[in-house]
């Protein structure tokens, strides 16, 4: 996000910090070799740890730039919104975590929908990366990591979309993301900590989240392809349960399969989890004045047919200019 207009013409009195962190294979590769390398500790969530370091740096140093370390808003869109929630969970569940790193959470078009995959769930992805680069399967984990680190960043980046398992996401490592996070919601502990810290949440979506998801890494016209693309997002058991709740296409038209993929992912990544989060907070006593929801249904006039077909409506990320 670019806050130039908010600050220069909108009168926003704020110091804006954009956090750079490791993405994709660099930030979220997980598997047995990485678990062994860390001696059973942190694995897979390197991008989240980068964010964490940045949060702590801002808290410690923002006053030198005219900011208020006790008045920080943590914000993100899409995967960034997912990360905002992950950072809050980490903070709430770690007894020795600083208690005042942020006062507000802004989550645009994403939320945590289910318990993230375990490193074991991600092993096929790790193995596929090794196979793609010709690293023998009989190599030890240490040898595999040594070979992977010899590959250039550009070659790794170029390989990603040639993989079946091309989406690298946070994992349940037991250190940053703990097992049973939804028990933490259901028993009221998340809401209790939210209230204790007197936090605020601003969260929402755009009207047609599904239309961009449908054409981004969408499936071919088959059930197997649909399952494969969904397992890039969710553990196999979650994918199986999801598919029980949707009427699947019977045609061989690729667009039909892309459309159902877009709907499932938009429901799973945005609509259902953020409603669950809001409902959980309110049902456990968080004041409704501290939870703000929105839905943007207005398509900006400069988003012309050249930019995106009108049939996409107000799709994922089309609200970005509104926050500038």
Q: Where are the model-predicted features located?
A:
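Alpha/beta-hydrolase fold catalytic core
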Residues: 235-285, 292-298
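Active-site rim elements
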Residues: 40-45, 111-117, 181, 255-268, ...
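Substrate-access "cap/lid" subdomains that shape
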Residues: 53, 60, 64, 71, ...
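Catalytic lobes of large eukaryotic enzymes
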Residues: 226-252, 311-323
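Cap/lid segment of the alpha/beta-hydrolase catalytic domain
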Residues: 1-52, 60-64
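Mobile gating loops/cap/lid regions near enzyme active sites that modulate substrate access
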Residues: 275, 279-324
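Conserved alpha/beta-hydrolase "nucleophile elbow" surrounding the catalytic nucleophile
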Residues: 77-78
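Short glycine-enriched nucleophile-adjacent loop
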Residues: 81-96
């Amino acid at each position: 996000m670019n806050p130039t207009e908010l600050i220069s013409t909108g009168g926003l009195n704020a110091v804006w910090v954009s956090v750079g962190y490791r993405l994709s294979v660099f930030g979220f590769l997980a598997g047995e070799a990485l678990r062994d390398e860390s001696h059973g500790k942190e694995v897979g969530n390197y991008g989240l740890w980068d964010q964490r370091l940045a949060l702590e740096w801002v808290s410690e140093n923002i006053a030198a730039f005219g900011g208020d370390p006790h008045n920080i808003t943590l914000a993100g869109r899409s995967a960034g919104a997912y990360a905002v929630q992950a950072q809050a969970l980490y903070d709430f569940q770690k007894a020795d975590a600083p208690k005042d790193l942020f006062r507000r959470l802004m989550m645009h078009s994403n939320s945590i929908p289910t318990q993230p995959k375990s490193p074991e769930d991600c092993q096929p992805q790790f193995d596929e990366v090794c196979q793609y680069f010709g690293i023998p399967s009989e190599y030890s984990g240490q040898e595999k990591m040594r070979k992977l680190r010899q590959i250039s960043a550009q070659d790794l980046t170029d390989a990603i979309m040639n993989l079946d398992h091309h989406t690298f996401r946070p994992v349940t490592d037991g250190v940053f993301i703990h097992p049973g996070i939804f028990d933490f919601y259901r028993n009221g502990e998340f809401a209790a900590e939210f209230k204790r810290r007197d936090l605020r949440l601003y969260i929402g979506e755009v009207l047609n989240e599904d239309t961009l998801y449908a054409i981004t890494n969408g499936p071919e016209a088959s059930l197997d392809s649909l399952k494969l693309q969904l397992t890039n997002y969710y553990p196999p058991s979650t994918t199986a349960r999801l598919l029980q709740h949707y009427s699947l296409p019977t045609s061989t038209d690729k667009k039909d399969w892309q459309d159902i993929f877009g709907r499932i992912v938009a429901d799973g990544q945005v609509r259902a989890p953020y409603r669950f989060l809001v409902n959980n907070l309110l049902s456990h006593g968080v004041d409704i004045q501290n939870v703000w929801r929105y839905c943007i249904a207005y398509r900006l006039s400069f988003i012309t047919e050249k930019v995106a077909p009108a049939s996409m409506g107000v799709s994922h990320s089309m609200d970005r200019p509104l926050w500038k």
